[in-house]
Structure formats: C-alpha cells, structure tokens
C-alpha cells in the first residue's frame, strides 16, 4: 500500500517500527541512503530482516543525472544519448538500450534491491524534469526503445516500471515544484504520448508509475488521482494487469490536495496499488491515513525477490565486463 523513504544509511528505531506496519509494502532508496556498494548491500539486508513480511526495495537508477548509487556502480549514460544514435543506426541503438537496461538492473539486483523505477518512456519535448531522461521526442522511436529496455531488464531478472503515465514530457512544468497541466485531447495523447506505454505493456512491463499531471480534457484531477485514467484507460482500454505506483506524494504538484491524508486516499481510491511516500517526515501521516484500510500488498509479491545474484556472481559473469566495455567505448562511462 505504501512505499516509504528512510532518512539515512542505517535504520533508526522509528523506521524499524514503521516496517512492522502491514501497510508498508516496501522502501524506496535515495542518494541520502547511499555511502558505498557494501553499505547498500548491508542496508538492503537490514531492511528485509527488520520487516515481518516480504519487503519491496526500490530505487531510481536510470542513469545520467538520476542515479542514486554511484561509487562502485557503472556511470550509466542518460537515455537521450542512446536515443540520439537511433537516426544513424537503429539496430545498434536498440542493442545499447538492451545493454544499458541489463547492466543497470544487474547491478541493482546484485545489491539486494528488487527494482529500479525504469525506464522513462515520456517523450522528450522540453519538460524541465524529464530533459535528457527521455530517449526521443518521437513516439514510435520511444516505443521501440521501450520494448528493448523491457527485454534488457527482464533478461537481468528485474521487473519493469514504465513512467510517467500517461506522459510527462509534453508539459513544461516540473511537478516536483509546480502544477503541470496538459490541455491536449485524449485522441492526441493516444497517438503520441501513450504509444510508448502501449509498446512497453505489450512487451510485458510489470508496473506503471503515474504522472502528477492534470489533463483537463480527459479528467479534472491529476492522473494519479484519476480512476478514469487508471481503471478506464490504463487497465480497461490498454489492458494493463500489473502494479500501479503513484509518483512521490511530497511533490508540489499534489501537495495541496487535502494534505498527506487526502493525497494518499485520492491515489488509492483511484486505483493505485502503491503510494510513494519518499520523505520520512510524511510517513507518520501517511500511515495514519491508511489505518483501517485493507492492505493490498499481495499485488507486489511478483515484484519482490526474484533471486539475488550478488556482486561476486555478477563480477564473474562474462557479460558484465563485456557490456560495461561496450557502453564505455560509446559514451565514455565507467565505474
């Protein structure tokens, strides 16, 4: 029901107490939780040991400027860099996307973390928050990359989360700090922004993360608060059967919607399976909000613990060094 954030590199007594609550489905990790590769392995183990049930551990490890784990991990290029190669050599670009996905997912899984919220399949059309996180401004190019990225993550044993549904890339505003409104008609969205999501779903994506964007010509509320977007369009028209995550409820775009309690209820009532409460100072209010609600954490079981390879196993895998070298040759990235 809730995916919460914790404050530092070790667990406090209060955080251990939070993990006892059945409403806590897992923990999302950030740069503030990272000190070293070994420390992340230890923190992952400590989180699982502290929880009385299977716990989902997640991170944003997209590459480029959104990469929470650094030292000891491959410095992954942003997706835009891979997307730029598509015009010259589509086949090579898609192979690089597969390798990028496999490398990212393998390193995260080796650290005891279940999933990275990836890939971004928003269109790259000037949004302040998306920027070089997007493959391209062309829906069909992004769709091709979405398929390749799903395949690469799955090859590494990691579930896939497409984000940010139904598309964050065509508005200017950054929902971390401002309300974003997209006035286009549904027909336009279906022929543009929804195309990569449809491709990713068809390729077997396991989860979708919602956008904190309002599309007033489709529904009056932000997409994550909208049963029309989640139940009618995503699950109904598009046939998605996986897990639906909210984006972080600490963002300014949704902060004014009834406070933490109102925001949590709005997401769950609309059909989100899991609400992200990334700021520890909001966790107590979020837990109060869900007290008495029936827990639906069973929806996440398929995302948790698909077998942890461990770093020794990954470093011994010949694919690891080969893919690292290939990406380094193309983009000048390394550990």
Curated annotation (Swiss-Prot):
One MF term in the entry's GO annotations: beta-N-acetylhexosaminidase activity
Main location: cytoplasm
Keywords attached to this entry: Cell cycle, Cell division, Cell shape, Cell wall biogenesis/degradation, Cytoplasm, Glycosidase, Hydrolase, Peptidoglycan synthesis
Binding site for substrate: 60, 68, 133, 163-164
Compartments, as annotated in UniProt: Cytoplasm
Family: Belongs to the glycosyl hydrolase 3 family. NagZ subfamily.
Protein name: Beta-hexosaminidase
Record organism: Xylella fastidiosa (strain Temecula1 / ATCC 700964)
């Amino acid at each position: 029901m809730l995916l919460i954030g914790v404050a530092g590199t070790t667990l406090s007594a209060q955080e251990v107490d939070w993990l006892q609550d059945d409403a806590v489905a897992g923990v999302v990790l950030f740069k503030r939780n990272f000190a070293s590769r070994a420390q992340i392995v230890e923190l992952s183990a400590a989180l699982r040991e502290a929880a009385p049930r299977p716990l989902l551990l997640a991170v944003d490890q997209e590459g480029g400027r959104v990469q929470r784990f650094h030292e000891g991990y491959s410095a992954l290029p942003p997706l835009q860099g891979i997307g730029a190669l598509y015009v010259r050599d589509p086949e090579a670009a898609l192979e690089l996307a597969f390798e990028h996905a496999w490398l990212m997912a393998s390193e995260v899984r080796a650290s005891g973390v279940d999933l990275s919220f990836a890939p971004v399949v928003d269109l790259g059309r000037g949004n302040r928050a998306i920027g070089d996180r997007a493959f391209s401004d062309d829906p069909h190019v992004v769709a091709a990359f979405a398929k390749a990225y799903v395949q690469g993550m799955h090859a590494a044993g990691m579930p896939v989360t497409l984000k940010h549904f139904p598309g964050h890339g065509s508005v200017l505003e950054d929902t971390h700090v401002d309300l974003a409104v997209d006035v286009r008609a549904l027909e336009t969205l279906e022929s543009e922004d929804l195309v990569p999501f449809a491709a990713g779903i068809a390729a077997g994506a396991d989860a979708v993360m919602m956008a904190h964007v309002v599309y007033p010509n489709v529904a009056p509320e932000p997409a994550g608060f909208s049963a029309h977007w989640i139940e009618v369009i995503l699950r109904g028209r598009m046939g998605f059967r996986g897990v639906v995550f909210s984006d972080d409820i600490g963002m300014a775009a949704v902060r004014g919607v009834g406070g933490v309690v109102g925001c949590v209820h709005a997401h769950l009532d609309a059909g989100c399976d899991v609400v992200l409460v990334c700021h520890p100072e909001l966790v107590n209010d979020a837990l109060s909000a869900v007290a008495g609600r029936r827990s639906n954490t069973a929806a996440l079981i398929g995302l948790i613990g698909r077998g942890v390879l461990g770093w020794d196993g990954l470093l011994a895998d010949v694919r690891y060094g080969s893919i690292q070298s290939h990406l380094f040759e193309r983009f000048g990235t390394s550990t």
